[in-house]
Amino acid sequence: MRNQQSTQLLFELSRAGRRAHRLGDLDVPSVNVDELFADEALAETPPPLPELAEGDVVRHFVGLSTLNMSVDTHFYPLGSCTMKYNPKRNERIASLPGFLNVHPLQHESGLQGLLELLYELQGMFAEISGLPGVSMQPAAGAHGELAALLVAAAYFREQGSDRNVVLTADSAHGTNPASAQMAGFKTKTVKSNANGLVDLEDLKAKLDDKTAVFMLTNPNTLGLFDRQIEEINKLVHDAGALIYLDGANMNAILGITRPGDFGADLMHYNPHKTFSGPHGGGGPGAGPICVRDFLAKYLPGPIVTRVENENASGDDDRYTYHLTSPSDDSIGRVRSFFGNTGVLVRAYIYLRTYGGDGLRHVSEDAVLGANYLLSKVKHFLDVPHGDRCMHEFVASATRLKKEKKLSAMDIAKRILDYGFHAPTVYFPLVVDEAVMVEPTETESKQTLDAFVEALFRITEEGEELIHDAPHSTRISRPDDVTAARRPILKWTDAAGESAT
């Protein structure tokens, strides 16, 4: 019954002559559209747009929204995504007219409040990272990676160096090698050792006078803090290369340690993961980057600077804020105007709300929750990298697949029937049948216990029940291969007319 109840498209709900609003009689002279445009600019037939009442449209989209899982409706343990609950006050404050209605072409004199906020946020990002140079221009995490690697390229170019290789870990996010390629570098992969950490011998073998950057995620995507970081730091820097820290997992170390303190030269933040930027929806996002002093002049601009007013009458006009280029050596703009400020405003509110001590509690609670889950899950799923983790952990369904024909994908599909979003599966690639779980700091012990109970029950269920799951969703298991090879990307009516 479930699969027969597919949601109808607006085009299928359409009825000829139905309208959302009706216009009054024309009280101005009518105009013939044919006389206003050239023949080639006019369509021969009207587009087959849906004809619907407003209520029909609202019910359609609200109905679709109820089919989705979200952080606001379900526990969302999607590993490597930090799907934490974000306070709604951040959304309300970011929507204040003074933030929402500014125009990027306004003169700086009319943007002083916003520029002051951005200036303070630059300082916060610098303090959290231990890296003083900050640009908030990039529009997402991967964009931040690209911008930072372009900074590294500019640095080596000015040094007269022909270093053109970026090393990435085999457990890294796929954006790492992709960003390196886009920045004009060649890439080599550094293997993990049996403990899930960087294989130092492989790193030594691949470091040479062509190595520009080693891109490291720490904690890594296995949820492990690399205890070899001091040795990694020495090896890379002794080879004349830079260390890039993928800040995707900063939620595990806020206020506990700083990338700059353990050797990173460049890094990016993911505000949508760590600092209450909205997840999903295609953006907008932000990917602020932080660098050491000697790299700051290459940062993309503009950045916000502050000038003290000599004739200030009080604190309200003590400073003036300006958008400026970091230097003549800047790599230039990587984003129009001054970045996606709406996301940055949310990050500022989040950081001001928690403060330094509060951020440390965020990470401590995130790590505590992940270790609590790991201590339970290890009794019925294999955990290949020990009994301790940081903010997330990776289990394996390999044994279950062999003994019970229960795969990681089966677990992910069946858990939906229990009212939980699926964990990440089959990533990172270094773990067979990977099940990656990240609970975040915003979930209660009761929620974590219920999730563990659901996972355990799934491992005890029959094959047929699991292989046909999910049973409670509108669509069960789509044919992924056919969808990829023969996608239907536009609506076509019975006569073959499309809406595009």
Curated annotation (Swiss-Prot):
HAMAP family noted in UniProt: GcvPB
Keyword Lipid metabolism on this protein?
A: no
- Xref: InterPro entries: Aminotrans_V_dom (IPR000192), GcvPB (IPR023012), GDC-P_C (IPR049316), GDC_P (IPR020581), PyrdxlP-dep_Trfase (IPR015424), PyrdxlP-dep_Trfase_major (IPR015421), PyrdxlP-dep_Trfase_small (IPR015422)
Protein encoded by which gene: gcvPB
- Name used for this protein in its record: Probable glycine dehydrogenase (decarboxylating) subunit 2
Q: What does the entry give for GO biological process?
A: glycine decarboxylation via glycine cleavage system
Q: Under the GO molecular function aspect, what terms does this record hold?
A: glycine binding; glycine dehydrogenase (decarboxylating) activity; pyridoxal phosphate binding
PANTHER family in the cross-refs: GLYCINE DEHYDROGENASE (DECARBOXYLATING), MITOCHONDRIAL, GLYCINE DEHYDROGENASE, DECARBOXYLATING
Which residues in this protein are found as N6-(pyridoxal phosphate)lysine?
A: K273
EC top class named in words: oxidoreductase
Q: Keyword Oxidoreductase, does the record have it?
A: yes
Domain of life of the organism encoding this protein: Bacteria
Subunit organization: The glycine cleavage system is composed of four proteins: P, T, L and H. In this organism, the P 'protein' is a heterodimer of two subunits.
| One of the record's GO cellular component terms | glycine cleavage complex
Q: What does this protein do?
A: The glycine cleavage system catalyzes the degradation of glycine. The P protein binds the alpha-amino group of glycine through its pyridoxal phosphate cofactor; CO(2) is released and the remaining methylamine moiety is then transferred to the lipoamide cofactor of the H protein.
Enzyme Commission number(s) of this protein: 1.4.4.2
* Co-factor(s): pyridoxal 5'-phosphate
UniProt record similarity statement: Belongs to the GcvP family. C-terminal subunit subfamily.
Q: Which reaction does it catalyse?
A: N(6)-[(R)-lipoyl]-L-lysyl-[glycine-cleavage complex H protein] + glycine + H(+) = N(6)-[(R)-S(8)-aminomethyldihydrolipoyl]-L-lysyl-[glycine-cleavage complex H protein] + CO2
Keywords of this entry: Oxidoreductase, Pyridoxal phosphate
